Amino acid sequence: MTNTGILAPSSQQSEPEWWTKTQKFFSRENTITPTFGYFRLLFGTQPGKTDIALIVIGTIAGIGAGIPFPLLGILFGELVDDLNSSTCSTTQAPPGGYQAAITTKVLQVIYASILNFVCMYIHTGCWSMVGERLVRRLRTKYFHSLLRQEIAFTDTLPSGDVTSRLVSDIEVIQAGTSEKVGLFIGTISYFVAAYIVAFLKVATIAAMLMSVVPIYFLMAFGGGHYIKKYSSRISTHINAATSIVSSSLSHMSIVHAFNANARLEALFAQHLVSARMDALKKAITHSIQFGMLYFVAYASNALAFWQGSRMIADLAEGKPSKVSVGAVYTVIFVLLDASFVLSQMAPFMHIFASAASAGDRLMTTIKRQSAIDGTSSEGDSTISLASEEIELQDVTFNYPARPEVPVLQGVSFKIPPNKHTAIVGTSGSGKSTVVALLERLYDPITGCVRVGNRDLKEINVRHLRGSIGLVQQEPNLLDRSILENIAHGLVSSSQEKHKHLLPILLGPSLSELTEKIRQGASEDEAVAEQGDVVREIVNLARHAATLSNAIDFINALPDGLATRVGSSGAELSGGQKQRIALARALIRDPPVLLLDEATAALDSTSERLIQAALTKVSENVTTVSIAHRLATAKDADNIIVMQKGKVMEQGTHMDLVARDGVYAGMVRLQNIGKFSSSSSIMTESTQVDVNIDRSLTTDTLLNKEEKLSLEQGVLDEKEKPAQLYMPEEADSLPTEPEAKKEKPKQTLWATMRGSFPLIRPNLLLISLGLITSIMIGVSYTGEAVIFGHTVGSLSVCRGGPSIRSSGMLFGLLFFILAVAKFAAVIVNGAAFGWAAEKTLYRTRVLSLRSLLRQPLEWHNADGRTPGLLVALVTSDASALSSLTGTTIGVLFSTVANLFAGVILSHVIAWKIAVVLLATLPVLLASGVLRLRVMAQYQKKHQKAYAKATAITVETVDNIKSIAAFSLEQEAYSVFNRSLKAPYKSNMKSVLHGNFWLSLAYSISTLVYALAYWWGSQQILAGMYTQVQFFIVLPALLFSTQSCGQMFALVPDISKARIAASNIVDLLSIKHEGDEEYDKTGSKASAKHTDPRFNMLEDKPRDVEAQLTTTTPSSFPTKGMGVQFRNVHFRYPSRPNQPALDDLSINISPGQFCALVGPSGSGKSTTFALLEKFYNPASGSIIIDGVDITKQSGAAFRDTIALVPQENVMFEGTVAFNIGLGARPDVEATQEEIEEACRLANIHDTIAALPDGYNTVCSQDGKQFSGGQRQRLSIARALVRKPRLLLLDESTSALDVESEKHVQDALAKVARKTTIVAIAHRLNTIHRADRIFMIEGGKCVDQGTHAELVERCESYRANVIHQSLDA
């Protein structure tokens, strides 16, 4: 596909037509064979000339590396002829002229060894670079493709899919396109060269054996087809499981609050069980494929021995024959060795098939055509949106994730230029969808959106979005500095005055600037070093921050504009994030401004100031705002009222109120009232009130409160998600579960000991696998014995009948060996495959269990991000499981082969064996050095690309913001910069490691030379016979060749070693309640039983099926009493800044209380301490008379429910998500779930879905609107039947009608529940039993709504501001 957009290469070099056709051929999707799939992987990603040169050179060198060994067969054949021509006696020494021939042949072997080393180093180096360059190209193309895709595509993308593609699939592809390719080519070259030599020597035998070659390829490709099929199925299940892990680790506060870890773990286990069955089928298929290769190889040798013996017998009987004993020996020797080498292809075929399958999965996304490409240069880029009318004409729309659910139904209205149009309506009525269509994040199903007289589809997407300033309902910030986030608004600005800023915005200058400031440089000095353009950007950012009322809190931060906001803005409060997002929109000075609940997270005073600023800057701007607070919409020039995807009415505030229609009803529901001169409330809402407000002060107190909020740096827990991503520190601890300063590095012995409990349940399978591995290893020694006796029996001096009978006997023995090895390999593969999958299941479940049980403080530690912790459960667990799979099988068979060969050689001819054995330490040393180099490489590689993966995941998570501000090019630049340093470092490590790999392989040829020379010397001296020599020689040479294969597995062993250390570290962490029954469902059966490894079910229960256990009547019927006594607390990440300072409050059982105060005053921190996410530094928190700070465990949470401000959905059905709220020992029934949904006013919405309560929620519930997600969260809390209900802005995203329904439901619950609420909307708390005013971490006032209005000016000012009648 030709890319003409902003992310296309700056220059395109013309390519030859033949190369273009080659690329197109291998890129064809209808090519189904694994071979073409693999070539499609190599050539379908537009490799450059350097890549082609590396492939060509690596292929030639690989071919060259395979040629020397078959030539040795000719030398050995000549030796046999020399021996046979000298004497027919096996004890008589050859003549003295034999010494000169030995010296010549030894030198030839040494030359072959040097040639082999050079060729091997070249081909391993070339292919390693090919693999490194290929995965880098795939990373960039995959990331680029994700940036190009329309939002509808990412909406339907499984949440764990991106991580899986960039971690698991990339690792598989790199393993299948690196040095192993060169080794594979060398093997094929070896095989072909061996047959060429065989045909030159004895064409008849060679032709017979050639007939079995198609069987090799049939098994290789047929097995590859099924392996690919099962790999695809496994990937589907693993992606779903990864999604659960990712969403769980991203929302640990919810997991802890509801003790949901057991249910999430069970759902995770279900997906693993499904994947395990396909993985077992894949392992059996692979073992059959591998076993057939061995069977064919050994059976062909049996045929060769039998036919060769007949030819030699004819020669011995004087019949005409051009065949010599040496020629037959050469054919048997080279084809025997070729068969051995070919049998080593099976593991490579498995790796290549997996790589091709992974490549196809990536290429599916890479080649996908985007319906709305924000990077394309197509469309009109000259049209101006200033002073143009915007019109929706009969628009219908439904989201791709829910195509059966209509969102907009024939919507038509006009947005006049340079006017303020407000859109109000019920939750889920389509308001935010209208904004998405105006931004062209989606296209209408029917109808059109027009700007002036142009259809929106005719305008260049980037130009359109660059003319619009968007503030979303849930503001998303990228993990950069505040300065960079605000400056993102300039990247695609349509204003000509901003064009010259683009090179700086896309480069590293701003990142370098903020890094210098964080390291201690003053802002003025750092800006001066960067130049005038950077200074201009900083000034623009400051001006925008001033307009959005953010400048005061920014200046109060230690690093100011250079402060990193964390992942998704986690280091900032909700109100602060919203103000930064508003500054990002205003900095581009757009002709169109879209505000989707732009001030929903702000206190009343801040909202009023921002509204005034917006009024000023939007004098000549077309403004479209969405609001649930009608007070922010009443001054609009036109108000559009929507319900159920239709426009119900429109007009000015006064007109709509006068009509007494839908809008007037909303006004009556939301109006708090107006005040008389005596400050008494004239009217009150009839609603039942459940939430709170962050009441800020009047203008005179605003700066004071900003100081309280920001100079102290206090973050409410709701404003600070559990996971903080800190890229500058991430590399220091990518996956280790304990900080380095706390946890020393695991020794090898400690790692092995810690891993044993994971493997112990599978010891029977592993033992069976080890026994068959030993049988496979020893079979090579048996082959050497048969081979040696065969060579001795083919002497013409023995007579024809004897030769024929010996040939028949040893041919039969070889066939028996073929059958035995075939059976052993199948049993071996099945046993190790099943053991590996069971170990993988156990490791992943236990790893997730341990992660979900860690406290929030642990998750908040530096370097622990959800993306990096996911790797512990996915790639690390997979790497560890390989130690109970094929890797350990090959390792043990190699060791068995080595020991059996050494022992047999010493028994048969110890003088020859002892000299050859002396070379073994050299061989092993080269392998150990390779292991050390590769271990260091794997660790560096794992760290290096973690940041690039995190950037990609963050981009997908924030794709709507990326698209809305056309940040594709900026994100692409940051991503590419993150790849440069790791790429250079990895290339050096690869080239260094391949030196030792080549040496480990090539040194075996020198062993050939030494064996040839020393063995001949012993034969000359009459110490040993030819039979003894030809038993010892292949026995030891097969052993050394096996060692070479073992060293090829070094990278896998290295990965497993690192992974095992990481997982053992994780599982070694002790948790509160390990000695007791814990909420994950594991219970120690004895005092000495480690509860971490208990009760792992192979068939987990179906957590989607809701079962009745405990009846509601068994629950307590009164609320909890809560007391805070002189509580002091500081967040671990900010130990010098108090969050709570001597807080004391008292909440009686059954009361409805509210916490009110400025942003960052400590309100949500009280919720975090009530849930025991953290422990206070001092003071007491008493629930029902028990001080929870002095109690172990968190059983008290069983009767507490939390509704967070940021509503979280997990991968699973709607019923599952709501059922997560049930108490740990209870499964909510379907009736209870539906009742909770009715109370939350969401039942009808769910019932209208095609799958109803079985509708699958994607991570974060992207297919639901913000209000719908909030109602689902409320239902989840209500199904718990809590005694204490914590509501953190629980109705902020609801329309007034839904809010009334919810509050009516909460009024029923309040009779036997204590409710504590935080809210901005004062109309939701004015009937609270007690309202606590929190400022600076203290309770500065308390009372009823009326009492606070009378004596607290700031509270009264907020009431006035929120009143529509004011």
From Swiss-Prot:
<feature type="transmembrane region" description="Helical">
    <location>
        <begin position="807"/>
        <end position="827"/>
    </location>
</feature>
<feature type="transmembrane region" description="Helical">
    <location>
        <begin position="995"/>
        <end position="1015"/>
    </location>
</feature>
<feature type="glycosylation site" description="N-linked (GlcNAc...) asparagine">
    <location>
        <position position="84"/>
    </location>
</feature>
<keyword id="KW-1133">Transmembrane helix</keyword>
<dbReference type="GO" id="GO:0016887">
    <property type="term" value="F:ATP hydrolysis activity"/>
</dbReference>
<keyword id="KW-0547">Nucleotide-binding</keyword>
<feature type="transmembrane region" description="Helical">
    <location>
        <begin position="288"/>
        <end position="308"/>
    </location>
</feature>
<dbReference type="GO" id="GO:0005743">
    <property type="term" value="C:mitochondrial inner membrane"/>
</dbReference>
<dbReference type="Pfam" id="PF00005">
    <property type="entry name" value="ABC_tran"/>
</dbReference>
<keyword id="KW-0472">Membrane</keyword>
<feature type="transmembrane region" description="Helical">
    <location>
        <begin position="868"/>
        <end position="888"/>
    </location>
</feature>
<feature type="binding site">
    <location>
        <begin position="425"/>
        <end position="432"/>
    </location>
    <ligand>
        <name>ATP</name>
    </ligand>
</feature>
<feature type="transmembrane region" description="Helical">
    <location>
        <begin position="180"/>
        <end position="200"/>
    </location>
</feature>
<feature type="transmembrane region" description="Helical">
    <location>
        <begin position="898"/>
        <end position="918"/>
    </location>
</feature>
<feature type="transmembrane region" description="Helical">
    <location>
        <begin position="323"/>
        <end position="343"/>
    </location>
</feature>
<feature type="transmembrane region" description="Helical">
    <location>
        <begin position="1019"/>
        <end position="1039"/>
    </location>
</feature>
<feature type="glycosylation site" description="N-linked (GlcNAc...) asparagine">
    <location>
        <position position="620"/>
    </location>
</feature>
<dbReference type="InterPro" id="IPR036640">
    <property type="entry name" value="ABC1_TM_sf"/>
</dbReference>
<dbReference type="GO" id="GO:0090374">
    <property type="term" value="P:oligopeptide export from mitochondrion"/>
</dbReference>
<keyword id="KW-1003">Cell membrane</keyword>
<comment type="function">
    <text>Pleiotropic ABC efflux transporter that may be involved in the modulation susceptibility to a wide range of unrelated cytotoxic compounds. Does not act as an efflux pump for azoles, including fluconazole, itraconazole, ketoconazole, miconazole and voriconazole, nor does it modulate susceptibility to cycloheximide.</text>
</comment>
<feature type="domain" description="ABC transporter 1">
    <location>
        <begin position="390"/>
        <end position="669"/>
    </location>
</feature>
<feature type="domain" description="ABC transmembrane type-1 1">
    <location>
        <begin position="56"/>
        <end position="354"/>
    </location>
</feature>
<feature type="domain" description="ABC transmembrane type-1 2">
    <location>
        <begin position="768"/>
        <end position="1055"/>
    </location>
</feature>
<dbReference type="InterPro" id="IPR027417">
    <property type="entry name" value="P-loop_NTPase"/>
</dbReference>
<dbReference type="InterPro" id="IPR003439">
    <property type="entry name" value="ABC_transporter-like_ATP-bd"/>
</dbReference>
<keyword id="KW-0067">ATP-binding</keyword>
<feature type="transmembrane region" description="Helical">
    <location>
        <begin position="52"/>
        <end position="72"/>
    </location>
</feature>
<dbReference type="InterPro" id="IPR017871">
    <property type="entry name" value="ABC_transporter-like_CS"/>
</dbReference>
<keyword id="KW-0677">Repeat</keyword>
<feature type="transmembrane region" description="Helical">
    <location>
        <begin position="106"/>
        <end position="126"/>
    </location>
</feature>
<feature type="binding site">
    <location>
        <begin position="1157"/>
        <end position="1164"/>
    </location>
    <ligand>
        <name>ATP</name>
    </ligand>
</feature>
<dbReference type="InterPro" id="IPR039421">
    <property type="entry name" value="Type_1_exporter"/>
</dbReference>
<dbReference type="InterPro" id="IPR003593">
    <property type="entry name" value="AAA+_ATPase"/>
</dbReference>
<feature type="region of interest" description="Disordered">
    <location>
        <begin position="727"/>
        <end position="746"/>
    </location>
</feature>
<dbReference type="GO" id="GO:0005524">
    <property type="term" value="F:ATP binding"/>
</dbReference>
<dbReference type="GO" id="GO:0015421">
    <property type="term" value="F:ABC-type oligopeptide transporter activity"/>
</dbReference>
<dbReference type="GO" id="GO:0005886">
    <property type="term" value="C:plasma membrane"/>
</dbReference>
<feature type="transmembrane region" description="Helical">
    <location>
        <begin position="202"/>
        <end position="222"/>
    </location>
</feature>
<comment type="similarity">
    <text>Belongs to the ABC transporter superfamily. ABCB family. Multidrug resistance exporter (TC 3.A.1.201) subfamily.</text>
</comment>
<keyword id="KW-0325">Glycoprotein</keyword>
<dbReference type="InterPro" id="IPR011527">
    <property type="entry name" value="ABC1_TM_dom"/>
</dbReference>
